[in-house]
Every structure is written in C-alpha cells, then in structure tokens.
C-alpha cells in the first residue's frame, strides 16, 4: 500500500491512529506549523510574522472562531488534525493534548506557517542525507541569542533547526532550501554553534540530539518553533501551538512552494 494522501493522513491523526511526529507522512504534501491565539492578539501576531518571515513564513490565517483552513485544506479541522498540541497559559506549558476540542473558543484565530519538512524532501532528492531521519529522531532545535523583531507582546529569540553536512555539501543544501522561501528558505548560519549562543549541540531545547558524522558541520535554519519560544515570553492567557515535529498536513503540494 502506498503512502497516504493528505486527507487520509489527517483522518488517521483524527482517529488517533497516528500520534507521533509527521516527518515522512503523506510524502509530497506540504506541512505547516500551527499557532492559535485570541483575536485580541491576532493583529500583533500577524505583524510579528510579517516582521520575521524567516522563522514565521505565513501561509494562512483563519477566520475568527473557525478551525477550518479554507485555503490549505478546506475539509480539515485544526482542533483535531494535528497529532499533538501544546497549550500555554500565561507563558507556562500546561498541557500536550491529542486534540483541543475542550479548549476551543469562538474568539480564536489560527495561523499556519511554513515548515522545513518541504525543503527536507528536496534535500533528499538532491542526494543530501537527513541525519535525524536516518537516526529515527526528531530534528534538533535550539533557542539562539538572535532576537526577533518585536510586535506588541510578541518578542523573543530566534529558534533554529540543525542538520549536519560535510563542508562540500553546504552550497548544495543552501541552494536547494533557498528555493522554498515560504518554508524557511536558506540557512541562517553555518558552523560555529557558539556564534548563535548554542553551548551544546547534544542538548537541544526541542527535538532530539543527532550524531554528526565524521567531518560534518552543523547547518542551521530558522524554525517555526520560534512562536513557541515567543509565546513563553508573551505571557498571554492562552496560546495553542503544534507540539514540535507534530505538524499539520495540508492539501498543497510541496512543488507549489518552489520558486
């Protein structure tokens, strides 16, 4: 049996048949990061995304009170179609549920942001390995010392994901990922994690540590977990996001986002 399409993948998630990370799920379909917050903070967050397009490439904003992403997946329900969510109350992580039906309110607005899984498939097609996939782990993510451009209550550090490559592979990784600006685009830094304030690659803030192969160096991309780091600092009464690595599968094809 072939890989499930986007709608089938979401149905499996909704039924609880797929509860883990979504890397490799529904190949060829773009996946998205999710941030949900009250309408009173939506304009500030929209400005935050516009001011920080590398970590927060905006794909869609839903109508207030609607869990349906009409552009990316008109038959979906953002309350149930992500394998795992994170619920923050006043900056504290309070819950990681499999659905957010009990949490849903009529004033909530959903933001869907580009995800690096799209350019990861392009990296594989270009003959570049993905260490975290080979090692059966979620991609490692790190909070950096770079600050995002603030908007209202939203201010905080840039979060990056890391994939290791040999120095001669880096130009290819840069050129391939740069073709997907709506999915974080080209790397923000190559080598020297200490330049980003990262003290230990073996202790990521999100995801899992990966083993670097001989001669490999770390390559860092802006990451859609950045809004979670920002949510911790914003201290809003309620912010809901996807759990790292547990994305929303859209009906849009990866190829639609290549430039």
From Swiss-Prot:
The keyword ATP-binding does not apply. Its EC number is 4.2.1.-. Pfam families: D-Glu_cyclase (PF07286). It comes from the Bacteria. Residues 1-24 are annotated as: Disordered. Coiled coil: none annotated. GO terms for molecular function: lyase activity. Keywords: Lyase. InterPro entries: D-Glu_cyclase (IPR009906), Putative_hydro-lyase (IPR038021), UPF0317 (IPR016938). Residues 8-18 have a biased composition (Basic and acidic residues). The keyword Cell inner membrane does not apply. Belongs to the D-glutamate cyclase family. This is Putative hydro-lyase Rxyl_2409. The lineage of its organism: Bacteria, Bacillati, Actinomycetota, Rubrobacteria, Rubrobacterales.
